[in-house]
Swiss-Prot record:
This is Cytochrome c-type biogenesis protein CcmE. Its main location: membrane. GO terms for molecular function: heme binding; metal ion binding. Keywords: Cell inner membrane, Cell membrane, Cytochrome c-type biogenesis, Heme, Iron, Membrane, Metal-binding, Signal-anchor, Transmembrane, Transmembrane helix. The gene is ccmE. Heme binds at H130, Y134. Residues 30-159 are periplasmic. It is a single-pass type II membrane protein. Residues 132-147 have a biased composition (Basic and acidic residues).
């Protein structure tokens, strides 16, 4: 192999290594910004296709209905705890902040936060359903069977 071919080979290897390093760093940086969507049942039992359950400390978005009678407000702060449910289960959520004006029991919400031990969500953001005609597609798909069932049938299997 002559010197010219060797130099081209080294340059090609260096470009490929640089490209691989760049892709790896971009994916690592984006990893902290990716929030996966789950329903309460998927947190308890895993995603349907893969049966993969979220890990403690994982950032995620959870969509469900606010269970009637579950909203508890701390009178000395802005801390609120409530339960969201779907056809397969329920999870507890705690949130520190001002809730959206449209937030109420029996209404659809999407919470964004971290999963803690005991299937508890520490929410950083709470989004309430905007009006009667719009539901995010993920929530609508997960909630289509819930409107006819009473909230009392949704219990956490761990309790």
């Amino acid at each position: 192999m002559n010197i010219r071919r060797k130099n081209r080979l080294w340059i090609a290897c260096a470009v490929l290594a640089g490209l691989a390093l760049t892709i790896g760093l971009v994916l690592y940086a984006l990893r902290s910004n990716i929030d996966l969507f789950y329903t309460p049942g998927e947190i308890l039992y895993g995603k349907r296709e893969t049966q993969q359950m979220p890990e403690v400390g994982q950032r995620l978005r959870v969509g469900g209905m606010v269970m009637p009678g579950s909203v508890q407000r701390d009178p000395n702060s802005l801390k609120v705890t409530f339960t969201i449910y779907d056809a397969e289960g329920s999870v507890d959520v705690s949130y520190q902040g001002i809730l959206p004006d449209l937030f109420r029991e029996g209404q659809g919400v999407v919470v964004q936060g971290e999963l803690e031990k005991g299937n508890h969500i520490l929410a950083k953001e709470v989004l309430a359903k905007h009006d009667e005609n719009y539901t995010p597609p993920e929530v609508e798909k997960a909630m289509e069977a819930n409107h006819r069932r009473p909230a009392s049938v949704y219990k956490d299997p761990a309790s």
